[in-house]
Amino acid sequence: MLSSAIGLFAVVALLNSFVSVHSEPTWQSFRVTWGLNLLSSRTFAKLPQTESRARSDGFARLAGECSGGKFLGHRYMKGLDTAAVIIYDENGYVAGIQHGIPKNDVEKVNTSFSFDRSSAYQLDKILGEEEVYFITTYFVDPNIICNGGRTKLQYEEEGVGTGLWVQNGTDPVRDSVQVPLYEKDMEGTHWVKGGCFRTMGVHYWYGAHENMTCTDFFPVTAIYNRGKLTNFAFASFGNYEFSRRFEHPSSTALTLFLPTPIPKCINDEYERSGGVSSMHVFFSVRPWNTFC
């Protein structure tokens, strides 16, 4: 069955390779979770790009105003799945996504990485009581999300967003750091080039080096296709299974994404914590048609 899925995957990718490989990638799609089986509803799953569509798809709004709290925008979650909490601006257009891991699950993991000390994770209560560590990313300038938002015309022209901002602290405006939109602008930054993986792209890891300590591990990797940011991924130490949106790369597969030489602490932390749980977010229309 796996061989059939891989064969189908290859055929679809080959057919799509004939579609304008020279044009710049656009952000017209919003999907999560990588996988080989294109027939699975879990793989490259589409997420709603508008607040109204989110409601019709079964997502419910979390408590909180658009601004004035730990995060920006109106947040929507489906059921109790904190792995993909979608953020919309005040006009109801997609503005970002959060990736959350319940504190109860984190406390079961044997890891030297501190979720409390990492500025990339913010602890928040949802549904009145459950504490969740959230990584928050925005797809438009954080300053506009609750200050006018995007117009319908802007959304139609720009698609899912105009860039990627990672909230790296308690203030969603002041502490949100923009990731370079083009790969050429990575030069001279702290982003370190890792491996290229077909159907994903070229991975970049912030501050990664051979002798780093995993207490400094940054849980977001930026991924480029044909020189432009087209997707990214969240990655946390621990084997979390509360959501079907998670990916669980083997230790061997994980090394394919990492910089060379591979940070020594990551393999150690992988064994100690029981693995890594990741979730890719894709903006390109046909993410499975990405070649190295």
PLM region descriptions:
Residues 11-26:
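N-terminal signal peptide
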Residues 1-11:
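Classical eukaryotic N-terminal signal peptides for Sec-dependent ER targeting/secretion
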Residues 22-292:
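Primary mode marks residue(s) on the alpha4-beta5-alpha5 output face of response regulator receiver
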